[in-house]
Amino acid sequence: MPELPEVEVTRRGLEPLIGATVTQAVIRQPAMRWPIPSHLPQVLHGARLLELRRRGKYIIARFESGCLILHLGMSGRLCLLESDTFPEKHDHFDLHFADGRVMRMRDPRRFGAVLWAGDQPDEHSLLKVLGQEPLDEAFNGEFLQQAIRTRSSPIKTVIMDSHLVVGVGNIYASESLFRAGIHPETPARALTLAQCRRLVEEVKLTLQDALQAGGSSLRDFFGADGNPGYFQQTYFVYGRTGQPCRVCQTPIAVLRLGQRSTFYCPACQQGQPPSNAMP
């Protein structure tokens, strides 16, 4: 699933459309994670795109007539193409603009979303429950320690909770915990303030590094311009089971947390060896 860096890379790739006017909205397949509203062609026709911003893993497109909320799901892409580009099998939604370009939703698994939010997108039920933006100043060590002080769940699971902090999925949680030297099974409430500060710092740095690399392209992700990301080439632990740690040469191990594969270095991330770890 695209995480914060991939969504932000996509948003930035669509920015050239700001100021353009919609000439046509085309719904080819309305059956996404939630049905694409059938009235979108009417409310978007003739509307100018005013703003593109990100909230967590959602992109909010503000038009003169209201706001679209876009989510890439597990395998979705938003492509910026020429309007005469012939649609492919999994191209489900188009926005054609007067300047001759089209924003196209491509989603083989159809877990993505195209929703209408009117004039108050932040009050939408999907957005108003979201936690802190990890790159904002408000997400700091003191905030994290206060938020997790009563939580006994593993810190890896907690840092992926979008009600606490948004956009930190499986890849970037694993990478950030490695950089911070924290075992993923550590109970969240056991972290000291110093550890919370270090973890917050590494979350921010990891996400910023991923943004600079254009995100991670493991299977489905490509930016709006069709280019892949390259951050996967620098992973410390994610997907590197059995390979030597880039720091200490210890083989990377994997365990299951919350139905997710969690990668870590047993030497660099000290903690009680977990019973369900697989070398």
Swiss-Prot record:
Annotated DNA binding sites: H90, R109, R151
SMART domains noted in UniProt: Fapy_DNA_glyco, H2TH
DNA repair among keywords: yes
Domain of life: Bacteria
EC number: 3.2.2.23, 4.2.99.18
Gene Ontology biological process terms, A to Z: base-excision repair
Function: Involved in base excision repair of DNA damaged by oxidation or by mutagenic agents. Acts as a DNA glycosylase that recognizes and removes damaged bases. Has a preference for oxidized purines, such as 7,8-dihydro-8-oxoguanine (8-oxoG). Has AP (apurinic/apyrimidinic) lyase activity and introduces nicks in the DNA strand. Cleaves the DNA backbone by beta-delta elimination to generate a single-strand break at the site of the removed base with both 3'- and 5'-phosphates.
Similarity-based family: Belongs to the FPG family.
Protein name, as recorded: Formamidopyrimidine-DNA glycosylase
